[in-house]
Amino acid sequence: IWKS
């Protein structure tokens, strides 16, 4: 999970 990254930048969303």
Swiss-Prot record:
GO molecular function: calcium channel regulator activity; toxin activity
Superkingdom of source: Eukaryota
RNA-binding as UniProt keyword: no
Tissue expression remark: Expressed by venom gland.
Record's subcellular location: Secreted
Gene Ontology CC entries for this record: extracellular region
Swiss-Prot/TrEMBL keywords: Calcium channel impairing toxin, Ion channel impairing toxin, Secreted, Toxin
UniProt function note: Specific inhibitor of store-operated non-voltage-gated calcium channels. Decreases store-operated Ca2+ entry and cytosolic calcium concentration in a dose-dependent manner in U87 cells. Exhibits anti-tumoral activity by inhibiting proliferation of human U87 glioblastoma cells (IC(50)=300 ug/mL). Also exhibits anti-tumoral activity towards human glioblastoma U251 cells, but with lower activity (IC(50) estimated to be more than 500 ug/mL).
Name of this chain's protein: Tetrascorpin-1
